[in-house]
Amino acid sequence: RGDIATDTIVICCGVWSPKVARMAGASIPLTPAVHQMIDVGPVPHFKDTKGVIEFPIVRDMDTNMYERQDGSGLEIGSYAHRAILHDPEDIPSNDEAALSPTELPFTQDDFDKQMEDALELIPDVLNDESVGIKYAINGLLSLTPDGLPLLGETPEVKGLWSAAAVWVKEGPGVGKAMAEWMVRGEPEIDLQSSDIARFYDCQKSRANIRARSAEGFNKTYGIVHPAEQWESNREVRLSPFYEREKALGAVFYEAAAWERPHWYASNEKLLDEFGDQINRREAEWESRWWSPIINAEHLAMRERAAMFDLTAFCIFDVIGPGALECVQTVSMRQMDVGHGKVVYTPVLSPSGTFKSDLTVMRLGDEHFRVVTGGAHGMADMKWYADHAPAGTTVIDLTSGWTTLGLWGPRSRDILASLTRDDMSHAGFPFGTCRMIELDSLRVLASRISYVGELGWELYVPIEQGAKLWDLVWEAGQAHGIAPAGIGVYGTTGRLEKCYRAFGFELDADFTVVEAGMTPPKVKGADFIGKEAHLRHRDSDPLAVLCTLTVEDHTSSSGQKRYMLGREPILAKDGSRLVDAHGRGSYVTSAGAGPSIGKHILMAYLPPENANIGEELLVEYLGEQYPVTVVTNDATGVFDPENTKVRA
């Protein structure tokens, strides 16, 4: 019918979306998968129903099934059968399909067990001999590698948007949110976890899409532990430290397809060293995907030094004419700083809420290096690239560089034994970076800290990473160095300092002011979200990010329980806490504080409850535990004066 010229296209073609996207040179990483459903009836129990739907849907989470009344019939759907995947190219055409292209022939063997479960659940409805199967299909729906929708502008093609992997329950909301995003530049609700730009190239491979989608299918109604790790398609991205880490008994979690140590079995000996300072979790649920070794590694870092594999960072350069303009526009903090300065900055949405937080190193007049979290790194890089003026290039360096973190009171002594460079506080101040020589390596060292200790991030080309590890490890032996995992870096060390994390405390639901991160002054240069941020500064916050400690862990059974995150925070009388914006208070992060001997929680509270010493409750698995507000700003509960970081 001819061509239509347009600047914007939205692909919302369901299971055909990948096929359509490839026509434009983009990737929509989903796979069609079978969801079995049967329609039985007429059901005598429903003979007097007048409407299509008069009874509530029943979700039987234990059997991964649902039952839904439909007129005089009953639909029974299942997520318990084996994962049955298809390729978009193999979906039959309208002419080839017996029913419709997404309604494939029913495979009865896959549903026999589910039918038995449905009969056990509602025998009064299904046991009548007059009830027969009216309709049975292997229907196709869309699965993604992480189980979330694929929304937003594709990173490959400007103006090509995706609204794919959207199930029926999400459809109306997604339509509204996508319209807002396209017209206003952001949706009203937080869709960052569903941003199609979140994937790295290796995560878009057919093998990964199918493996992760198959693994995730049976978890649709499953009980998934907050820290549960993927089992399929592992060891895709390996840091140069990987073999050393394996030899030390590293327990690997995955981050942006990288294998990253969470703790090291070789540090079990530290449990005896620190003894009663380390708590042991008694309940099986919160002991999953956790080890007391994490707390031991934490204490070894606080007392001596620890080294961390930070290769999963996403690293990209903004370089060329207009680079300063680009980073000023995207970053909230002042970027027009001296060469060698390191700036931590929030990245805001137009409405002044959080789009990310990251660090930026100024390496030259028009050369900036951005370091951000691996999980949202690709979306961050796209955001900078979207706002880069002509002549400015955004270059992904993630696979070209590796990062080793070294922190603890002995870290300066360790580096000093390897270099002639001045590593003193005067010679290498906090918040600066520069090239140093460690033995035969030239290393970009950045003096910042996410764990509240003196130390540096050390960057080298990835092929030099093994040498860097060996140098620091050997030099550290005389100082009692320990390898430490992300359990310390991302949880215990961070929480003791009350450092905020994107995706936990920082997201599109809260503002900089509410997060307690208001800078003393606002830079003169314009930046995305500035107008909204100025309004927020002039108004009292509707919520305050606080740090709380748990005062008593004892459950009704006498067993001590430890919160994992996302639990409701309640008033002392057990009533819900809801701020003036309608947001309920809940735990954004939870974890041990080994240095203070307390379990630490972070949560946004209504201002009237955000008082130091305020006694509240946290609800965990149906029971309530007493908690106390210990900070109502960004001051750490450990080393509040920051003397260790700036030693």
List where the protein language model places each region.
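Flavin-dependent oxidoreductases
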Residues: 1-105, 112-117, 121-129, 207-229, ...
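A short alpha-helix-loop-beta-strand transition element characteristic
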Residues: 27-31, 187-191, 252
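C-terminal catalytic lobe of FAD-dependent flavoproteins
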Residues: 62, 71, 97, 101-233
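Short amphipathic beta-strand starts and helix->beta connectors
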Residues: 145-146, 296-303, 347-357, 388-390, ...
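Acidic, proline/glycine-enriched N-terminal capping motif
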Residues: 198-345
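Conserved, structured C-terminal
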Residues: 226-254, 260-262, 289, 363-647
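Internal amphipathic helical hairpin motif
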Residues: 321-356, 409-441
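Well-ordered mid-protein domain cores that form the structural environment of catalytic cofactors
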Residues: 329, 333-390
